[in-house]
Swiss-Prot record:
This is Putative ABC transporter ATP-binding protein GSU3001. It is a peripheral membrane protein. Its EC number is 7.-.-.-. Transmembrane segments: none annotated. Pfam families: ABC_tran (PF00005). It is found in: Cell inner membrane. GO terms for biological process: cobalt ion transport. GO terms for cellular component: ATP-binding cassette (ABC) transporter complex. Residues 1-237 form the ABC transporter domain. Belongs to the ABC transporter superfamily.
Length: 279
């Protein structure tokens, strides 16, 4: 599935303009990020792409068709939104019942429902958790259960609202690993809204910076993270790895304590190591 967003303006009911001049595309099989601070409009943008918000000036095309011209059931068979708080999405008593709700509602036979649930739970590393009660899951497991519910319905596109929010550093990394695996191995197109900058350059194909309802920068992460001053102007910072690379390229080096190397020697060693890693 391919998204083409040309959003001229969206305003809240009180007239406050939330989004304006938003233009970007998401290709089939792409892992795309929308990076912005809290209140920048990320969640609102995802809801527009999912068809939950339909009153706006502009267009959002899904495979060339305006999402507002599609019936909700037609959108939800292919595109799924995962909310930031999994408790807003999970409702059943057990993991199986929650993940099975979508396929059952689509009319699949019970044997097919069971097979879809098993495949989906295995895909999100929750195999064997079908009988668990939802409230016994950890926060990270709940997020995975939400993803499983959409995979069981056969969704080709996942819109993820802050998927790493509320997770510890290891949980954040594992979530990004999961999404990357779904994208690279299963071919799921993913659009991820986030305010976390450090994991972004490691996984995404393309990144857009959203500030005050406008996209101010976009492209591959390695191109986006080349302007520290511009990042600071939108209340964001460079990822630690990008900051290190920037300092190595544009300053005298990065000082390290307790090292037998001079700053210049350390700089050369690190740059050589980075080149070796790339090759």
């Amino acid at each position: 599935m391919r998204f083409s967003v040309d959003l001229k303006a969206y305003a809240y009911p009180d007239g406050t303009v939330a989004l304006s001049d938003i233009r970007f595309q998401v290709a089939r099989g792409e892992f795309c990020g929308i990076l912005g601070s809290n209140g920048s409009g990320k969640t609102t943008l995802l809801k527009i792409m999912d068809g939950l918000i339909r009153e706006y000036d502009g267009s959002v095309l899904l495979d060339g068709r305006d999402v507002r011209s599609l019936q909700p059931k037609d959108i939800y068979r292919t595109v799924g939104l995962v909310f930031q708080n999994p408790d807003d999405q999970l409702f059943a008593h057990t993991v199986f019942e929650d993940v099975a709700f979508g396929p059952r509602n689509m009319g699949f036979a019970e044997a097919e429902v069971k097979a879809r649930v098993e495949r989906a739970l295995e895909a999100v590393d929750l195999a064997g958790a079908a009988a668990k009660q939802i409230h016994h899951l950890s926060y990270g497991q709940k997020k995975r259960a939400c993803i499983a519910g959409l995979l069981a319905m056969g969704h080709e596109v996942l819109l993820m609202d802050e998927p790493t929010a509320g997770l510890d550093p290891m949980g954040e990394y594992r979530m990004m690993e999961l999404l990357t695996r779904l994208n690279r191995q299963e071919g799921v197109t993913i659009v991820m809204a986030t305010h976390s900058v450090d994991l972004v350059p490691l996984f995404l194909h393309r990144l857009y910076i959203l500030s005050r309802g406008r996209i101010v920068r976009g492209g591959p992460p390695e191109e986006v993270f080349t302007a520290p001053a511009e990042m600071e102007s939108v209340k964001l910072r460079l990822p630690h790895i990008a900051e290190l690379i920037h300092r190595l390229k544009h300053e005298d080096g990065v000082p390290f304590r307790r090292t037998p190397l001079t700053i210049g020697e350390a700089r050369r060693e690190i740059m050589e190591l980075m080149e070796t890693t790339r090759s």
